[in-house]
Amino acid sequence: MNSKFILKYFILAFFLVSCQTYQIAYDRFSQVLDSQYDIGVNYSRDGIFKSVISIKYDKLKNKREYFILVRVESRNSSQIKPEKIITDTRFEAKGELVSEDSKRVVYYNDFYDSYFPYDYTTVITEKNIKVEIYKFIISESEFIRFVALGNDNIAAFRIYAFRNDVIVSFNKIPFKKFLDDFNSKVKLLGGS
């Protein structure tokens, strides 16, 4: 009976750890604790938005940096440049382009034969997809107000892009677990 209980507990613990939506890593060379909390994916008329909240702690400077990263995939990047975000606490942050890349995606029909990949009749569409990552810096006081547990457990922000507005929301309760985990790792490094 005792071994079954331990096995069930081990499986449950493994499942909970594997389902985490965040990552925290420490780089010993630069002495920076970096974290990312995955909020999820939102779709608009012209593209796909993937949002991540990131907190960095620099041990040498004893300083934290809070920001939201937005990854945008679109077929026409001139139509979908995130200009700013506004949180539900009315904080506004301007976007800064961090990285851009493009990739070619080819969709094939059901009769596609991998032995003859150059058969032009099997291609349905080809798309050149632009991938851009934007960074929105948030001050520490505004960030704490934004994620503080209050009357409701949902935090939200709106991404304003050219002809595309997307509302992104997330639950504050699992986010608080991520924040507590990050703060405990900062304390282990001797920070406050």
Swiss-Prot record:
The secretion signal range is 1-18
Localization (cell): Cell membrane
GO cellular component terms attached to this protein's record = plasma membrane
Q: How is the protein disposed in the membrane?
A: Lipid-anchor
Would the keyword Plastid be found if you checked this record's keyword annotation? no
> Lipid anchor (S-diacylglycerol cysteine) at which residues?
C19
Tell me which UniProt keywords the record has, alphabetically: Cell membrane, Lipoprotein, Membrane, Palmitate, Plasmid, Signal
Instruction: Report which superkingdom the organism of origin falls in.
Output: Bacteria
Q: Which residues are listed under lipidation as N-palmitoyl cysteine?
A: C19
Q: What is its main location?
A: membrane
Q: State whether keyword Lipoprotein applies.
A: yes
Transmembrane parts of this sequence? none
- In its UniProt entry, what is this protein called? Uncharacterized lipoprotein BBD10
This chain's source organism reads: Borreliella burgdorferi (strain ATCC 35210 / DSM 4680 / CIP 102532 / B31)
